[in-house]
From Swiss-Prot:
It is found in: Cytoplasmic vesicle membrane; Endosome membrane. It comes from the Eukaryota. GO terms for cellular component: endosome membrane; Golgi stack; membrane. This is Vesicle-fusing ATPase. Its cofactor is Mg(2+). The gene is nsfA. Belongs to the AAA ATPase family.
């Protein structure tokens, strides 16, 4: 028997590929009989195929420990290594290596983390049993040495797999050959998939949290304020399940949320939230599209645009399955393309086809589980119902007007750079502005900040000498007065319409006695009840009385003094020229807007005029009547409160129409019915005490406030004695006959 020439304690051999394909699955080095006998002279032939014949292979400065077996069909000076071992050791065929006997120092492997993939990359196959594969690793490679990065092959269920050692932990601190350890039946094998692998296997690795969020984000840096609760809701519903490993979610039988709808008034930050969600997440940027941009003039192209948005998610899910990354698709102005099917008149059907295509892509026959579709709209009521069901856009988050704390956050965000540049004066108090700007949206608060800055800029500019402006950045200071002027300049869309209320009470309110005192106290009591009571979030009050007795003025005064953030008046004057349907829609919109504010007051003036009541016939609009009847009794959404104050001059008509039951109470607004009340009114209208006393002597029958004011003003236009003129006007208008 000829031996290869020894080099010290080792022999020099040339690397060759294994002759037998089955040798690739043993993770052993194969030696000629002569070389094996030289290194292991005392090993009996029945032990040739055990894993306890260890050799050390030196490749340059690197050393590798393997189990060895003899092969009689090899050249005398060669060593056979599998493709996996050659790739791991970075050696090629015919390269010379040094091999020596290795006396083991058994470092028992406590646990070994191994990644797995098909030997043929990109292959897909049936689901594999992880426990069966782990069992084969223990059986096939028991007593073999392993270390980090080592590659080896195994067979299971007629499939071949490549495995790579990701980590090795020993039970004891090794005395030599650190990083190497021997597999034993007690070794815990932790199996995981290689990156990009398509293998279908339930891994048993530690439950690692998916780091889908970046670690350094916060609301203020993102430019989002006042939406802490909304973000918590979004995180819980849409992202919490995605943090857990797919295997855990699959065990629970839970599907990820695939879509959410952000809705609310304009300017509240819906688009901003959706855009910033992409910055919160690790990985790819979201696709942001405007609803109208989906539509195309060519037949079928609109539907193709929808499919193209989901194409990347489809490809990755087919390639990676549950390990696919999250694809976010954001639709701005969703109501432009997803109106309820069948609601369009004279339509070509493209709109309905787009809705159908979107429904199929989100949750159709071949649904995707790696997408999150975010839609935004101001008109949730226009969206097709099928799109809002669970499995599609199932999470509905209302982005409402910010509260006081939220408004302060928004002010801080939009003045952050001013603070950094020391451009805010010391008297600026953002908390006060947040308290003042009730029902301002985020966009309107930004408008306030820009308006305040414009006042600061204007102080540095001489309008008479614009060409020679000397810019001194250090002199630009935004002060408290700038913000106060800006707040009066920028009015909220969902705020109080003070100008409208002032026109209803131009002459103010005259307290003419105990009767009016009681009436005013009752009205204020209802206001306080709505403010403080949690049991009555909705209160409807009817003010009834003769024309001109001051019902509208009293209703406007109660609404204005309530200091509710949202106050509106629905008056026949504002709906002049509208048809019945348009009037009903306008009335409904006012009430819908009121539900977006924490506390609201709506004044419905002259109900009989609104419903177009005419006694001849009689004739009235049943559509408007039923609209009012429903809205007067509808409970606002949770957390919202509404006070409705309506006025009428014909309560009997309303009773016949069965609308009186919609009101919690009816307050009668009386006319001036006593001489004492008449005297008080005259005094409040500018009479001297003597003139008021004399005028009261003319009083004989009830009269309304409006009539008294008209007569007083007419008397003042006449020449001569004012009291005589006043008496004459009373007689001319036959007021005594009332």
């Amino acid at each position: 028997m000829s031996y290869p020439p020894p080099v010290g304690d080792s022999i020099k051999l040339k690397v060759q590929a294994s002759n037998d394909p089955e040798e690739a699955f043993t993770n052993r080095a194969y030696l000629p009989i002569s070389s094996f006998s030289f290194l292991f002279p005392n090993v009996q032939s029945n032990l040739y195929t055990t894993n306890t014949n260890y050799i050390k292979i030196r490749v340059g400065a690197n050393e590798y420990i393997l189990s060895a077996s003899p092969n009689k069909n090899m050249k005398p000076d060669s060593i056979a290594l599998s493709k996996a071992l050659r790739g791991w050791m970075y050696v090629s065929n015919n390269e010379e290596v040094y091999v020596e006997f290795y006396d083991p120092n058994p470092n028992i492997c406590g646990s070994m983390k191994v990644s797995i993939d098909y030997l043929t990359k990109g292959k897909q196959g049936p689901k594999q049993d992880s426990q069966e594969i782990i069992g084969k690793i223990i059986d096939n490679f028991n007593s073999q040495y392993f270390t980090f990065g080592q590659l080896f092959y195994i067979k299971n269920s007629n499939s071949t797999f490549e495995l790579r050692v990701e980590a090795v932990e020993t039970n004891e601190v090794p005395t030599k050959d650190k990083g190497w350890a021997i597999i034993s039946p007690a070794t815990k094998i932790i199996l995981q998939k290689m990156p990009g692998s398509l293998i279908d296997i339930e891994t048993n690795g530690p439950l690692v949290v998916n780091q889908i969020f970046t670690s350094d984000w916060d609301f203020e840096n993102m430019g989002i304020g006042g939406l802490d609760a909304e973000f918590r809701d979004i995180f819980r519903r849409a992202f919490s399940s995605r943090i857990f490993p797919p295997a855990i979610v699959k065990k629970l039988g839970v599907n990820h949320v695939k879509g959410m709808l952000l809705y609310g008034p304009p300017g509240t930050g819906k688009t901003l939230i959706a855009r910033q969600i992409g910055k919160m997440l690790n990985g790819r940027e979201p696709k942001v599209v405007s609803g109208p941009s989906i539509l195309n003039k060519y037949v079928g192209q609109s539907e193709e645009n929808i499919r193209m948005l989901f194409r990347d998610a489809e490809i990755e899910q087919k390639a990676k399955g549950d390990d696919s990354g999250l694809h976010i698709i954001i639709f701005d102005e969703l109501d432009a393309i997803c109106k309820s099917r069948g609601s369009r008149q004279g339509d070509s059907g493209v709109g309905d086809s787009v809705v159908n295509q979107l429904l199929a892509m989100i949750d159709g026959v071949e649904s995707l589980n790696n997408i999150l579709v975010i839609g935004m709209t101001n008109r949730k009521d226009m969206i097709d119902e099928a799109l809002l069901r669970p499995g599609r856009l199932e999470v509905h988050v209302e982005i409402s007007l910010p509260d006081e704390h939220g408004r302060e956050q928004i002010f801080k965000i939009h003045t952050a750079k001013m603070r950094d540049q020391n451009a805010l004066d010391k008297d600026v108090n953002l908390a006060n502005y947040a308290h003042t700007t009730r029902n301002y949206s985020g966009a309107e608060i930004e408008g306030v900040v820009k308006s305040a800055a414009s006042y600061a800029f204007s102080r540095q500019v001489d309008t008479k000498n614009i060409k020679n402006v000397e810019i001194k950045p250090e002199d630009i200071k935004v002060c408290d007065q700038d913000f106060k002027r800006a707040i009066t300049e920028v009015t909220p869309s969902f705020g109080s319409t003070d100008n409208q209320f002032e026109s209803y009470a131009e002459n103010g309110i005259i307290n003419y006695g105990p009767v009016f005192d009681k009436l005013l106290q009752s009205g204020n009591a209802f206001v306080e009840q709505v403010k403080k009571s949690n049991r009555t979030p909705m209160m409807s009050v009817l003010l009834s009385g003769r024309p001109g007795c001051g019902k509208s003025s009293l209703a406007a005064t109660l609404a204005k003094s309530s200091e509710f953030p949202f106050t509106r008046i629905i008056s026949p004057n504002d709906l002049l020229g509208y048809n019945e349907s348009a009037k009903a829609s306008k009335i409904t919109k006012v009430f819908e807007d009121s539900y977006k504010s924490p506390m609201s007051c709506v004044v419905v003036d002259e109900i009989e005029r609104l419903i177009e009541y005419v006694p001849i016939g009689p004739r009235f609009s049943n559509l408007i009547l039923q609209t009012l009847a429903v809205l007067f009794k509808r409970t606002p959404p949770k957390g919202r409160k509404l006070l409705v104050i309506a006025t009428t001059s014909n309560p009997d008509i309303l009773k016949d129409m069965d609308i009186m039951d919609c009101f919690a109470t009816v307050l009668s607004v009386p006319s001036i019915s006593t001489a004492k009340e008449f005297q008080t009114v005259c005094f409040e209208l500018g009479f001297t005490q003597k003139e008021a006393s004399e005028a009261a002597s003319f009083f004989t029958s009830p009269i309304t406030i409006k009539q008294i004011i008209m007569i007083v003003e007419m008397a003042r236009q006449e020449e001569g004695n004012f009291i005589d003129n006043f008496k004459m006007c009373l007689e001319d208008f036959n007021i005594r006959n009332f």
